[in-house]
């Protein structure tokens, strides 16, 4: 069964997110630093009648990187072609996509860190000088063909910016760090979603739901759908703070946005290793999860909320973790 607090996209959520997607920067809630910079860069590019510099958007899943790419294209008034790193298996796949671009178009590559190196190398000249050289044929009969490209904007999105090669990263003129949402911004998103889908929700309920959504709009919208179900079956259809708390408690989402897996990680650290330090590999084995899963899905939020610290010797549970789970904490 999928974890309800998973920040990766699930089921029909892609369709839901398209329905909720804002069209312009003024409609986009949160990520103000990224928005303010992009507004200037986009207006300047339009005034010069040039393609916008290539843009790299990075940060945890579910924070709106894909939405931002579509908003950028709308602001520029150009077409957007969407693909992803895992889909582009060979250089010829990328060449076919590049060959379809019109002047000023946006090419959006999600999970750009997963591009094969042979494909990435084709991007270098395409991004820098808007041309590619490709080999036609094989063996002695092969020949190089020079293909000019129209000026275009590449928008790359990644959850693993550290996995990008230096040559690729250096070719992005604009970078945007998408951060976890503050409580107020996420509350506004919950209320906007409820309004679009004609759900009746109190401000207190929206605030409580936002508080327990791990700073992530995708999770907030998912929880809102589940809480609506509880409101219809256990209440009068109105989503208030009482039904919200009852629903999220039944879904094992506590007041800090932690679920049973998060709590299992912290309890294991405290009960088996006296709070740590404990290595990530050892911790992963004890909770029966893959190391990469713990590192990518669980740990970032626990660190961001101050429940875990990374040290040279391993992960350490903080006093806040002890207090949250009801353990007595003593300084080591």
Swiss-Prot record:
Annotated keywords: ATP-binding, Cytoplasm, DNA damage, DNA recombination, DNA repair, DNA-binding, Hydrolase, Nucleotide-binding
Extent of the signal sequence: none
Binding site for DNA: 291, 310, 312, 315
GO MF annotations, alphabetized: ATP binding; ATP hydrolysis activity; four-way junction DNA binding; four-way junction helicase activity
Main localization category: cytoplasm
Assembly, per entry: Homohexamer. Forms an RuvA(8)-RuvB(12)-Holliday junction (HJ) complex. HJ DNA is sandwiched between 2 RuvA tetramers; dsDNA enters through RuvA and exits via RuvB. An RuvB hexamer assembles on each DNA strand where it exits the tetramer. Each RuvB hexamer is contacted by two RuvA subunits (via domain III) on 2 adjacent RuvB subunits; this complex drives branch migration. In the full resolvosome a probable DNA-RuvA(4)-RuvB(12)-RuvC(2) complex forms which resolves the HJ.
Entry note about domains: Has 3 domains, the large (RuvB-L) and small ATPase (RuvB-S) domains and the C-terminal head (RuvB-H) domain. The head domain binds DNA, while the ATPase domains jointly bind ATP, ADP or are empty depending on the state of the subunit in the translocation cycle. During a single DNA translocation step the structure of each domain remains the same, but their relative positions change.
Name of the protein in question: Holliday junction branch migration complex subunit RuvB
Species of the source: Streptococcus pneumoniae (strain JJA)
Organism lineage string: Bacteria, Bacillati, Bacillota, Bacilli, Lactobacillales
């Amino acid at each position: 069964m999928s974890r309800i607090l998973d920040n990766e996209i699930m089921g029909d959520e892609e369709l839901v997110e398209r329905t909720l997607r804002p069209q312009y920067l003024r409609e986009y809630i949160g990520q103000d630093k990224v928005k303010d910079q992009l507004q200037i860069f986009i207006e300047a590019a339009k005034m010069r009648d040039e393609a916008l510099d290539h843009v790299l958007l990075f940060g945890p899943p579910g924070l709106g990187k894909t939405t931002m790419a579509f908003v950028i294209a709308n602001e520029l008034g150009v077409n957007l072609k969407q693909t992803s790193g895992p889909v582009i298996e060979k250089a010829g796949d990328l060449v076919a996509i590049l060959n379809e671009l019109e002047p000023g178009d946006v090419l959006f590559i999600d999970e750009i860190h997963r591009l094969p190196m042979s494909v990435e190398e084709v991007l270098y000249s395409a991004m820098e000088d808007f041309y590619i050289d490709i080999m036609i044929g094989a063996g002695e009969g092969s020949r190089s063909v020079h293909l000019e490209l129209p000026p275009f904007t590449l928008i790359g999105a990644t959850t693993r910016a550290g996995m990008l090669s230096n040559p690729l990263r250096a070719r992005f003129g604009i970078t945007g760090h998408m951060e976890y949402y503050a409580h107020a911004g996420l509350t506004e998103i919950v209320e906007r979603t409820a309004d679009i889908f004609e759900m009746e929700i109190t401000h207190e309920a929206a605030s409580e739901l936002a508080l327990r959504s791990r700073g992530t709009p995708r999770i907030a919208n998912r929880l809102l759908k589940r809480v609506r179900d509880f409101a219809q079956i256990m209440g009068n259809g109105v989503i208030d703070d009482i039904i919200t708390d009852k629903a999220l408690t039944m879904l094992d989402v506590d007041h800090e946005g932690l679920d049973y897996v998060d709590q299992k990680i912290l309890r294991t650290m405290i009960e088996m290793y006296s709070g740590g330090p404990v290595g990530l590999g050892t911790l992963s084995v004890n909770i029966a999860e893959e190391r990469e899963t713990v590192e990518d899905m669980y740990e970032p939020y626990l660190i961001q909320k101050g429940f875990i610290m990374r040290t040279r010797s391993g992960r350490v549970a903080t006093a806040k973790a002890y207090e949250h789970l009801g353990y007595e904490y003593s300084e080591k």
